[in-house]
């Protein structure tokens, strides 16, 4: 394995999922993260797979059969080795095509509301990469071209022709991202609003608004920004600067929502993500819930669990079970204790 703190680990859980109980810094979150990498080849906690390698190791490997389908992902400095039912997959796209879907919930989700735009872009990107292979490819091309353009701008020399060539890629792939994000947000709006009412138990109105940083015409925005980008030595327009506006009862949620409302909005956003994945793909995502239940009151915990599809697989981490009796739906899930890098049933 050699994944973060684990040199090796084997765990067998029921199809319904597992509750992982243990103190902080014992590896509970890492288990959820490894499952996310196995399913989606990406971590919600890091953009780079290299950062997941256990200290002193050359790479990591994760394997499992979450849907009666043996999957293996092995990372090393020279690339990824991917297999499904022992058959090699030549690239990430072919590995992900018949794979599963993931919704990750954690306390860091509060940053979706009160944090910088990067957090909300990651929310949209994690959704988009699962919904649409074209989105995943466009985002990969966009990031590579953006990195190259920024390097040329930082160089400071006149290299206009090279910069323009990368801008053509940025316009083509960026337009795909913008159109997709606008469509995703439009589909999320009613789902998030419904989830907000269910979890809060109140008639609260949650509204999502897509804000493309470049306006509707990306090519024209880049043209208008050329002098500014030359002066600042970085690209200042494009989907990498987009944002997702969140309003509660007509007011900016990050400025006016209470702590309880912030937690409810974060849950509503992730529940909406899960429902949209289910509607589009026709299958239930795995819900990975990292230490969120201890921070919720019984009403919100039960509303959350009742809103999740009964057939979905749920993995939950927690440091204590004081809240468990008040949440019968969680009490029915198998429990495991995690301590010192070991998992005990």
Per-region residue spans from a language model:
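Conserved NTPase motor "head" modules and their coupling/switch loops across ABC/AAA+ ATPases, GTPases
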Residues: 1-23, 37, 49, 161-172, ...
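Conserved lysine of the Walker
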Residues: 28
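Hydrophobic positions in the central parallel beta-sheet of the AAA+
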Residues: 287-288, 316
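Walker B catalytic acidic pair
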Residues: 290-292
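Long, charged N-terminal accessory/stalk domains
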Residues: 111, 118, 122-164, 168
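Nucleotide-state sensing region of NTPase/ATPase domains
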Residues: 36-119, 123-135, 186-194, 219-228
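Structural recognition of the conserved hydrophobic beta-strand(s) that form the central parallel beta-sheet
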Residues: 64, 313-320
């Amino acid at each position: 394995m050699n994944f973060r703190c684990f040199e090796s680990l084997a765990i067998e859980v029921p199809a319904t999922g597992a509750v992982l109980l243990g103190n902080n810094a014992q590896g509970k979150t890492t288990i959820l993260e490894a499952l996310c990498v196995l399913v989606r080849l990406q971590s919600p906690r890091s953009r780079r797979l290299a950062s997941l390698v256990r200290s002193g190791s050359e790479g990591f490997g994760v394997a499992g059969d979450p849907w009666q389908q043996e999957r293996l992902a092995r990372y090393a400095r020279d690339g990824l080795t991917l297999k499904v039912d022992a058959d090699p997959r030549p690239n990430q796209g072919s590995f992900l095509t018949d794979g599963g879907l993931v919704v990750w919930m954690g306390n860091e989700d509060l940053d979706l509301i009160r944090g910088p735009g990067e957090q909300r872009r990651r929310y949209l990107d994690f959704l988009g990469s699962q919904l649409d292979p074209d989105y995943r490819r466009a985002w990969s091309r966009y990031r590579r071209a953006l990195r190259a353009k920024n390097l040329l701008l930082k160089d400071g020399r006149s290299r206009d022709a090279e910069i323009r060539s990368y801008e053509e890629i940025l316009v083509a792939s960026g337009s795909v991202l913008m159109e997709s994000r606008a469509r995703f947000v439009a589909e999320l709006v009613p789902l998030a609003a419904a989830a907000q009412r269910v979890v809060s138990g109140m008639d609260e109105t949650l509204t999502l608004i897509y804000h493309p940083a470049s306006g509707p015409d990306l090519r024209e925005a880049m043209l208008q920004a050329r002098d500014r980008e030359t002066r600042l030595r970085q690209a200042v327009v494009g989907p990498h600067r987009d944002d997702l506006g969140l309003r509660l009862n007509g007011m900016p949620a990050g400025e006016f929502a209470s702590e309880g409302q912030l937690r409810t909005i974060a849950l509503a956003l992730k529940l909406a993500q899960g429902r949209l994945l289910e509607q589009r793909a026709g299958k239930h995502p795995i819900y990975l819930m990292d230490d969120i239940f201890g921070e919720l009151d019984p009403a919100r915990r039960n509303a959350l669990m009742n809103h999740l599809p009964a057939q979905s697989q749920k993995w939950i981490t927690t440091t204590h079970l004081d809240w468990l009796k008040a949440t019968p739906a969680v009490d029915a899930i198998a429990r495991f204790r995690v301590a010192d890098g070991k998992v005990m049933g």
